[in-house]
Amino acid sequence: MPTWCKTFLARAGIALVACLLAAGQTNAQTRPALVIAVNSVGSKLDPADTPLATELKIFGSIFDTLIKRDYAAEARDPGGGAILVPSLATSWKRINPRTLELQLRQGVKFHNGDELTADDVAFTFSPERIFGTNAMLPSARQFLRCLDPVEVVSRYTVRIRSCADDPTLELKLAHYSAAIVDKRAYLSLGQAGFKRAPIGTGPLEFVEWKSGDYIKFKAFDAYFGGRPTFQSVVFHEVPEAAARVAGLVSGEFDIITQVSPDQFSTIESNPDLQVLPSLLEQMQMLWVVATEPVVADRRIRQAMAISIDREKIVSTLWDGKTNSDNQFQLPTLGSVYDGARKGFQYSPARARDLLADAGYKGAQVTLRVIGNYYVNGETVAQAVQSMWQAVGLNTKLEIVENFTQAYAPGAAAVMGGCGFEYAAPESLGSCFFGDQALTRQRGFPKGIPGMEALAQQLATMDQSQRKQVFQKILDVFENEVPAIPLFRTPQFFAAKRSVHWQATPDFRMDLRPDNLSFATAAR
């Protein structure tokens, strides 16, 4: 509180309101004006509009979901599975295998002052917006699958129904595509207007967007999760990695994204800076184009998978700051995870035997990677090329400009990724099973043999049965080899040491008050 206020109150005991207002203004000014450098600010900020990773980083603190994952608690209990906690919903219960009833948090405000009600939830998941024939954003169905129209029980109670039995419904409601939007604002602005001037319930309130330059937000002090610890946040677009690091070193930026391992030493040599790592629930992998004659025999694909020394790649190219992965499961899957599973174990000798059994005669195996797209992408591809050549695979590496070139005829394998969008086997569907699975475009046009029937069996609510089914799915993966897992996809941020913030296992930057604080006052 300003000194003049203390003196005035001591002498007169009046003008309390004016003094408290002045104190509030002073406190607001002492909060930091946070500046974050990102490689891109993207072009849209609608959570259901298939956001890019760069857009996810920004809108993660604009919107909230009904349920959220407690990543901090999960970190304290690795292998314990996903931990779900209240967010915009204070509680929920299963009515039946298809239906959840949720109680909404009362008094929650959107940035425009509207109160969150059941009508906003119903609109968010409506046929008009996502699930109808002429929906605005049908692409969100790849994550949310199929939901019936929301039943509004009362102003603060809703029932959300899946179109079929769904043991993952709670997890889907914690997914970023399930973030709740303001019905009135959305319809007033239209989808095109809303995605450029978003209105949510989170701690970031939109102020200004200059395309290709920056997006500015101010603190939403009415945020239901507590008063934000910042005064404002600006996301600056800085495409060049070296420029982001230079800006952090100079003090221009507080946090930077997309830090590569070769920049660690520059940052860590400065006592005022820190590298902040996070492992995404995503795997860097190689898609295998099984329609290419040279890899049509599954034994050759199996040889490709077991001839890669993942530990060596992680230790030499990632400084040990990620995990090697030789199978498509993660501990966050909880009860369906099998920690004893061996996956694609490194065995060059066995790989050579498989190639001999398949009658491989030295045909060219073309590996493609998009240049300057994945951190360390070309270097990892070169390592894989060398390992394949070591077991006798005649491997040619091609660096291309885009995905169209990557999947042009001739590719036997292409570097890519696949993530657990939510902590359940079903979230692999967009990659490996279902009519829209990427594998249907990338080597298995009729689907992976045996996969679809197993995927349908995941709908059971019996967790032991789900585990058995999922482990059979992994058996199919290891037999057919539609893709070859390499390692967990890491993401690296860097920040001033005065910034106390933890990156999460998804792309969203969580700037809520329980995850962001500062050791010093604002500049």
Regions found by a protein language model. Give the residues of each.
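Surface-exposed binding/hinge segments that line
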Residues: 29-30, 93, 103, 109, ...
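N-terminal lobe/hinge region of extracytoplasmic solute-binding protein
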Residues: 37-96, 126, 197-200
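Gly/Pro-rich hinge or "lid" segments in bacterial periplasmic/extracellular proteins
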Residues: 70-75, 79, 83, 155, ...
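Aromatic- and charge-enriched surface segment that lines or borders ligand/interaction sites
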Residues: 90-134, 159, 244-247, 294-296
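Ligand-site clamp/hinge motif
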Residues: 192, 220-266, 385, 394
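Extracytoplasmic/peripheral linker and loop segments enriched in polar/acidic and small residues
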Residues: 299, 390, 394-405, 428-497, ...
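Structural transition elements
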Residues: 323-357, 371-378
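Long beta-strand-rich cores associated with HINT superfamily self-processing modules
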Residues: 493-523
